[in-house]
UniProtKB/Swiss-Prot annotation:
It comes from Staphylococcus carnosus (strain TM300). This is UPF0297 protein Sca_1229. Belongs to the UPF0297 family. HAMAP family: UPF0297. The lineage of its organism: Bacteria, Bacillati, Bacillota, Bacilli, Bacillales.
């Protein structure tokens, strides 16, 4: 039996999860480097889900698409609330 005839299993646990902070930092820096307003572009992506808001440069688009938008928003809100609690 040929290896191509077997059903392969894919385990998401084997794929390293992207660190939300490092991805957002890269996306932010890439947007700034390209002359965009990073906050507006990221918000546009989060609200619409349209990856066209994020450039392909520096793998920014590929990186941010690997993370669920809900997970990004959860991280942003959590960090915002924790930061405002400290002030």
């Amino acid at each position: 039996m040929n290896n191509y005839d077997k059903t392969m299993r894919f385990n998401l646990d084997d794929v390293p999860k992207e660190n939300v902070k490092s991805v957002l930092t890269n996306v932010y820096n890439t947007l700034k480097e390209r002359g965009y307003d990073p906050v507006n572009q990221i918000v546009g992506y989060l609200l619409s889900g349209d990856p066209a808001y994020i450039p392909r440069h520096n793998e920014a688009r590929n990186q941010i698409r690997r993370i669920d938008r809900d997970e990004i928003m959860e991280e942003l809100v959590s960090n915002y609330l924790n930061a405002s609690k400290d002030n």
